[in-house]
């Protein structure tokens, strides 16, 4: 029997449909409904939000399928779920369950410290994290249909997401300004597929959407990432670790949409209650940096 796989065009088109929106982490049906009512374009079903994964330590794996099914049955918007880096079987299970997207995620403990999944071998589209253009293009080369900054998940600290978005966009501008005979050296230096380097020069942008993720905790954080060129925003711990999740969720959705309306963002930020408690990056041990979990 011939194996069916989704084409890049179809997968990327599905991801494009989420552009300009907010995708929220949820751990049960109740949270999923709050996210949908607030205007989220999709939800990420998982067992624990990144801040809880960070606090618990140990090995973080794919969520219990019961949780994923519960979320899928609760909402009409697309449902994503996380698989460990390189864990073929977790990804196949999620695909068989009918999730709309799989996030091959560094938030979970990698199953393979050398190889990522060959995402082009799946029908379901994948989202992956990146810190620079080399990581971005390697993931696209493997078949990712959507990218996100890695940031530093579960910290409530936006600084790493800002760094990664600026790095990727700066390197895109660098490639766009190269002459054709410089592109092969660029591919070597970035550790990226040559054909994708050429495509970036032609397009002047990535061939897939790139969302902001990792540390978004306030409406202003979401608006900042959109101003820096993000195509949308993932919010992990920032919603349901806040004092008022429903109000925070709605405010972040509106700030993402109207990210240059600073008066509105100021109003949205009033009387929200306390955001999630943040972590200063200098206080993280090297082994606790989730963003370093990939190649």
Swiss-Prot record:
Known EC number: 4.3.3.6
NCBIfam families (UniProt xref): PRK04180.1 (NF003215), pyridoxal 5'-phosphate synthase lyase subunit PdxS (TIGR00343)
A single BP term in Gene Ontology: pyridoxal phosphate biosynthetic process
Functional description taken from the UniProt entry: Catalyzes the formation of pyridoxal 5'-phosphate from ribose 5-phosphate (RBP), glyceraldehyde 3-phosphate (G3P) and ammonia. The ammonia is provided by the PdxT subunit. Can also use ribulose 5-phosphate and dihydroxyacetone phosphate as substrates, resulting from enzyme-catalyzed isomerization of RBP and G3P, respectively.
Catalytic activity: aldehydo-D-ribose 5-phosphate + D-glyceraldehyde 3-phosphate + L-glutamine = pyridoxal 5'-phosphate + L-glutamate + phosphate + 3 H2O + H(+)
UniProt family annotation: Belongs to the PdxS/SNZ family.
Assembly, per entry: In the presence of PdxT, forms a dodecamer of heterodimers.
The organism's place on the tree of life at top rank: Bacteria
Binding, D-glyceraldehyde 3-phosphate: 166
Official protein name in the record: Pyridoxal 5'-phosphate synthase subunit PdxS
Keywords from the UniProt entry: Lyase, Pyridoxal phosphate, Schiff base
Active site: 82 (schiff-base intermediate with d-ribose 5-phosphate)
Keyword check for NADP: no
